[in-house]
Amino acid sequence: MFKLLSKLLVYLTASIMAIASPLAFSVDSSGEYPTVSEIPVGEVRLYQIADGVWSHIATQSFDGAVYPSNGLIVRDGDELLLIDTAWGAKNTAALLAEIEKQIGLPVTRAVSTHFHDDRVGGVDVLRAAGVATYASPSTRRLAEVEGNEIPTHSLEGLSSSGDAVRFGPVELFYPGAAHSTDNLVVYVPSASVLYGGCAIYELSRTSAGNVADADLAEWPTSIERIQQHYPEAQFVIPGHGLPGGLDLLKHTTNVVKAHTNRSVVE
């Protein structure tokens, strides 16, 4: 009887802690997630996912349309780690101002997950603010070739598919080529948050979009590596649009394969 009561007490305690924990969020919290229509270009919104973890959301005009773009903010002691710029100098300056207003901790380091302007545009603003900017050697090289802003410091140990390195409160993972040959994903172990960047699509997206620098053949395999490496992820943030769960990975694979099949037929 005593053992039975002890087990029951442990179960009840764990249940109460799970309910009370700030990390016990629901993936359906994306219903409150800021959307493109709510964010004027030049402004930034922050969305708290868990204790010490936020996404940042900005919008940008491109080819006559306005698109949302996500990034990540993770607390690292009394400092903040920023993942990706807010797509441009004006947006990134607004991001730093919003962080100061809402969080009140300094951003000391920033990682760009690939070389496109929605990830590195604004690096110069960060550098001027005293933020140490990082990217893989591949991203830095491709950004230079593209004429984009170049993060200052190189992240080593991310050259081969499946490589992972710890960087403060997060793990950086190179799944292989997908949206671009250099794209990284970021995992926050303390909150089971996976930031997929542009390698992952939101559920409402049905077209592959910009695949000029993509490796369509390798993309599904790279997503499979992400799934295998982070099966415990609960909250998945795409590069653009609304977050969800691990179902975003399967959805992205389906969209990419459909695009590839159409291209073959055409």
Curated annotation (Swiss-Prot):
Chain sites annotated for binding Zn(2+) 1: 114, 116
GO cellular component: periplasmic space
The UniProt record lists the keyword Hydrolase: yes
Regulation of this protein's activity per its record: Inhibited by chelating agents such as EDTA. Inhibited by a fungal natural product, aspergillomarasmine A (AMA). Inhibited by 2-triazolylthioacetamides.
Substitution effect: residue 65 to W: Modest decrease in catalytic efficiency about 8-fold, with respect to ampicillin, and increase in catalytic efficiency about 9-fold, with respect to cefuroxime
Pfam families according to UniProt: Lactamase_B (PF00753)
Cofactor(s), by name: Zn(2+)
Keywords: Antibiotic resistance, Hydrolase, Metal-binding, Periplasm, Signal, Zinc
SMART domains hit by this protein: Lactamase_B
Outcome following mutation: residue 87 to A: Reductions in catalytic efficiency, about 8-fold with respect to cefepime, about 20-fold with respect to cefotaxime and about 100-fold with respect to ceftazidime
Main location: periplasm
Enzyme Commission number, as recorded: 3.5.2.6
Reactions it catalyzes: a beta-lactam + H2O = a substituted beta-amino acid
Region forming the signal peptide: 1-20
Note in the entry: The class B beta-lactamase family has a specific amino-acid numbering system known as BBL, for standard numbering of class B beta-lactamases. A multiple sequence alignment was used to derive a consensus sequence and then the consensus was numbered taking into account insertions and deletions. This allows use of identical numbers, e.g. for active site residues, despite differences in protein length. UniProt always uses natural numbering of residues, hence there appear to be differences in numbering between this entry and some papers.
Family per record: Belongs to the metallo-beta-lactamase superfamily. Class-B beta-lactamase family.
Role this protein plays: Class B beta-lactamase which confers resistance to the beta-lactam antibiotics, including penicillins, cephalosporins and carbapenems. Acts via hydrolysis of the beta-lactam ring. Has penicillin-, cephalosporin- and carbapenem-hydrolyzing activities.
SUBUNIT field: Monomer.
Protein name, per record: Metallo-beta-lactamase VIM-2
Lineage: Bacteria, Pseudomonadati, Pseudomonadota, Gammaproteobacteria, Enterobacterales
Gene: VIM-2
